[in-house]
Amino acid sequence: MRKKTSSNKKNTAKKNNNISLHRKLGLIYKKTILILKIVLIIFICLFAFTKYFASLKSYLKTNIYQTTTELGFKLENVIIEGQQNVDEPTILKVLNAKKGSSIFALNLDEIRNNLKNNRWIKEVYVSRRLPSTIYIKLFEREPIAIWQINNQLFLIDEEGYEISKNIEPFPHLLHVVGEGANIYASKLVNELQKYPALINKTSSAIRCGDRRWDLNLKGGINIKLPAKNFEEALKYIDALNKANKLFNQNYKQLDLRDKNKYYIEKY
């Protein structure tokens, strides 16, 4: 009799455990469904209210722009300063606003960013001058040389930045050639500008091994500059030119790479 009683107790305990587990699973399922319903309701509410507020915001903006325009805050004038190589129609196209439209409807940051997409423009300042003027101050890139690389020609600024492929308006600029020539052109141009007579007779500068320059002068003279302190070599060439001992000596090549000994080759 004792054995049967013990067995019955075990069976009863198992049944109770199974019932408890089912209840727990049922509660978890119900809670999960409830949470999902709440999340869904929140998303529906957010979507509905967002659309409502967006619509309200748009309505208010339209009315504010209309009211301020009637009060005289409308676009009548555009003042542009610093403009040299960027034409006015290009700037006004970026402005994308009709005369008489609300001056507050213009997004100044957007105008500024769009203008900076023009490769000529390094920096730009845009502001409203109430009640009716937009002021644009341009800081354009200044071309210092024409860079030839991979059979292509580019106008470059002092940073080596490729401004434009339209080189025709700048035939007077120094022609620099080779890999890295755009990066190092600024220093060479600045030094050559100290000797106007010399730079005017320099047809091109070739970057050699990304470490030094060869100058090709008019008249077929090639000058090999040293990798370091080429300023002294330029002084020497300018002195020869001033003494009239450069272009009438039948020179083919002047090798100035060794500051202690110059080599001269004639035709």
UniProtKB/Swiss-Prot annotation:
Pfam family, one: POTRA_1
Cell compartments where the protein resides: Cell inner membrane
A single cellular component GO annotation: plasma membrane
Claim: Coiled coil is one of the keywords in the record: no
UniProt-listed PROSITE patterns: POTRA
UniProt topological domain (Periplasmic) ranges: 54-267
Transmembrane feature ranges: 33-53
Cytoplasmic topological domain: 1-32
Keywords (A to Z) from UniProt: Cell cycle, Cell division, Cell inner membrane, Cell membrane, Membrane, Transmembrane, Transmembrane helix
GO aspect biological process, one term: FtsZ-dependent cytokinesis
Occurrences of domain POTRA (ranges): 73-141
Family statement drawn from the similarity comment of this UniProt entry: Belongs to the FtsQ/DivIB family. FtsQ subfamily.
Role this protein plays: Essential cell division protein.
Protein name per Swiss-Prot or TrEMBL: Cell division protein FtsQ
Lineage of origin: Bacteria, Pseudomonadati, Pseudomonadota, Alphaproteobacteria, Rickettsiales
Gene that specifies this protein: ftsQ
